[in-house]
Swiss-Prot record:
UniProt subcellular location: Nucleus
Residue ranges for the DNA-binding region feature of this UniProt entry: 46-159
GO molecular function, one term: DNA-binding transcription factor activity
Transcription regulation among keywords: yes
Keywords: DNA-binding, Nucleus, Transcription, Transcription regulation
Gene Ontology biological process terms, A to Z: leaf development; leaf shaping; meristem maintenance; negative regulation of DNA-templated transcription; regulation of DNA-templated transcription
SUPFAM superfamilies: DNA-binding pseudobarrel domain (SSF101936)
Organism: Arabidopsis thaliana
GO cellular component: nucleus
Annotated protein name in UniProt: B3 domain-containing protein At5g06250
Pfam family, one: B3
């Protein structure tokens, strides 16, 4: 008779693996939390859509003057003093930024008297190549809320706008579609002597059928060839002519009219079996 002994080494191995898994999970959660807090501590400064010259061979990014003077002010002597040396103002200073991965980027920031513009020069072309930036892409700048010396730089592709604008566009499209559907669900006319031909509305069959399923509740009472349908709070009796070869049958029903629809006929069509219901509003 053989006895299998539980290996002590195996027990220690399992215990070590469990501890490692717990440590990895805790580290991942801590990193995620730290990243979230880090992003929350960033203050957005400004952004700029890149021009062809910004990503071209000129090796420079033009910073809009209002943003440059507000967030990256150079020494006032270098910019505004009449006695300032042009070479000193164009030499400028070095600015350090962190990208989304934490990598540090250093750019020379200066003021060009010739074009009267603030620019990032040395080091900019490396950033363009590393991120593979193209004209129309957007770069944005941020600053740490509690440590103003920490600056951040980020970027996004052209056309990647905010979700709110996309949601607003989708909402407008949906509203427009519902308006068009409502118009074709019910067609009201004043004192028609003859109802419109079925072919005039046949291409609206699918939309109207959907509306009928949504807004009407069919009754379980079906006697012979008649069918009772409740539509918009009104019980309608649809007479089906079984001997008629034409699948388009018009049925007239007199109901109490809402305000503003006195003496009007309302025509309602189904896609299958292509019946038309005429509501005479009193």
């Amino acid at each position: 008779m053989s006895v299998n002994h539980y290996s002590t080494d195996h027990h220690h191995t399992l215990l070590w693996q469990q501890q490692q898994h717990r440590h990895t999970t805790d580290t991942s959660e801590t990193t995620t939390t730290a990243t979230w807090l880090h992003d929350d501590l960033k203050e957005s400064l400004f952004e700029k859509s890149l021009t062809p010259s910004d990503v071209g061979k000129l090796n420079r990014l033009v910073i809009p003057k209002q943003h440059a003077e507000k967030y990256f002010p150079l020494n006032a002597v270098l910019v505004s003093s009449a006695a300032a040396d042009t070479s000193s103002s164009e030499k400028g200073m070095l600015l350090s930024f962190e990208d989304e991965s934490g990598k540090s980027w250093r750019f020379r920031y200066s003021y060009w008297n010739s074009s009267q513009s603030y620019v990032l020069t040395k080091g900019w072309s490396r950033f363009v190549k590393d991120k593979q930036l193209d004209p129309g892409d957007v770069v944005f700048f941020q600053r740490h809320r509690s440590d103003s010396r920490r600056l951040f730089i980020g970027w996004r592709r052209r056309g990647q706008g905010s979700s709110s604008s996309v949601a607003a566009t989708n909402s407008a499209v949906n509203t427009s579609s519902m308006g068009a559907l409502s118009y074709h669900q019910i067609h009201a006319t004043s004192n028609y002597s003859n109802p419109p031909s079925h072919s005039e509305y046949s291409h609206y069959g699918a939309a109207v059928a959907t509306a009928a399923e949504t807004h009407s509740t069919p009754s379980s009472s079906v006697v012979g060839s008649s069918r009772t349908v409740r539509l918009f709070g009104v019980n309608l009796e649809c007479q089906m002519d079984e001997n008629d070869g034409d699948d388009s049958v018009a049925v007239a029903t007199t109901v109490e009219s809402p305000d503003g629809y006195y003496g009007q006929n309302m025509y309602y069509y189904y896609s299958h079996p292509h019946n038309m219901v005429i509501l005479t509003l009193l």
